[in-house]
Amino acid sequence: MPLLYICLHNGRDTSIFANAQMFYPAAGVMLAFLLARRQGTPKRFYILHIAAAALMLAMSVLSAFLPQESWLNIANFVIIIASVLGWIFLLTEKKTKREDYGLHLHGKFLTAFAICAYFLVVKTGMVFLSVALQGGDAWAEYLTYWQSSAPWLMALVLVPNFFLSFLPFFGEEYGWRYYLTPALQGRFGARRGALAVGVLWGLWHLPLNLFFYSPDTSLQSITAQLVVCVTLGVFFTFAYEKCGKNIWLPVVLHYLNNSMVLVWTGTADISNQIISWTDVAISAIMYGVVFLPFLAAKCYRKNK
């Protein structure tokens, strides 16, 4: 957090910190498994992810003291190389190791497709509704944007881009959904465990809320972050359970949630936002209505 403050105070780009932070949850789980000498771990993939996380951390630290515009480009290059190697290591790993450590690639693909389609439709609808609430001029401008080729071309690019940049999204979901959610559900029950993970997931973003996403309206940003993480956590956990504990579905959903911002808004810049309490209230209502009903799903009715 102090490094983020230094970068912000000196007017430097803090995007690399957001990218690096996504690697840490899975890296912590993997490091713990390796140090515990657990049998049958997919060591190559684990070591790759830990090394990528360490490299991203090192670059984040260096960017605070050795400022240059190329740090983010270097980080993106590391993500691409690590993601490609990650696929190679996963696809050449023994099936039993993938199965034992939640990395299996099979699953209910039609169900997964339907869940992704639902997510895209409702999230896109939420964006359109948010713009409509801003008034006629904003609405007209937004409709003009969608009449251009830009959002459609960017949406197409996101398909191959997933395979070149999946590792940070996996980094969060393997930590939150694969490891921590079952651990807390075993202690507090299915619903309360998932909700607790959502709160922790939201608080995990605290440094970014303070120094990256919305430094000038940080309290609103923190509140909105908690709303989003709790509600999306409910849905991501439902998706994970519905498709036979397939970690790749929440990874894809997380990727869509973050990367579709480029399609929905025409920009990938999510820093220095100004968030009002009205924005927070609208977000809470929309996310609550769309995602909290999944708490009634079968996977949440066990061990209440």
Predicted regions and their residues:
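Residue-level signature of the transmembrane alpha-helical core
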Residues: 23, 113-117, 158, 162, ...
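C-terminal membrane module of polytopic membrane proteins
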Residues: 216-222, 243-248, 252-304
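Membrane-interface helix/loop boundary segments of multi-pass membrane proteins
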Residues: 121, 170-198, 212, 238-246
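Central hydrophobic cores of alpha-helical transmembrane segments
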Residues: 46-55, 194-200, 248-259
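Alpha-helical transmembrane segments in multi-pass membrane proteins
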Residues: 5-93, 111-114, 141, 151-160, ...
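Membrane-interface capping segments at transmembrane-helix boundaries
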Residues: 34-41, 91-99, 293-304
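Membrane-helix boundary elements
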Residues: 198-219
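Juxtamembrane "helix-exit" motif on the non-cytosolic side of transmembrane helices
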Residues: 2-10, 59-70, 129-136, 207-214, ...
